Curated annotation (Swiss-Prot):
Protamines substitute for histones in the chromatin of sperm during the haploid phase of spermatogenesis. They compact sperm DNA into a highly condensed, stable and inactive complex. This is Protamine-A. The keyword Nucleus applies. GO terms for cellular component: nucleosome; nucleus. It comes from the Eukaryota. Residues 1-27 are annotated as: Disordered. GO terms for biological process: cell differentiation; chromosome condensation; spermatogenesis.
């Protein structure tokens, strides 16, 4: 269970970064 909670936290952080926008900017 603890491992799952840690993964969820990482997912939330990744969503905040919005990699999709960064990729568009790179183009």
């Amino acid at each position: 269970a603890r491992r799952r909670r840690r993964h969820a936290s990482t997912k939330l952080k990744r969503r905040r970064r919005r990699r999709r926008h960064g990729k568009k900017s790179h183009k």
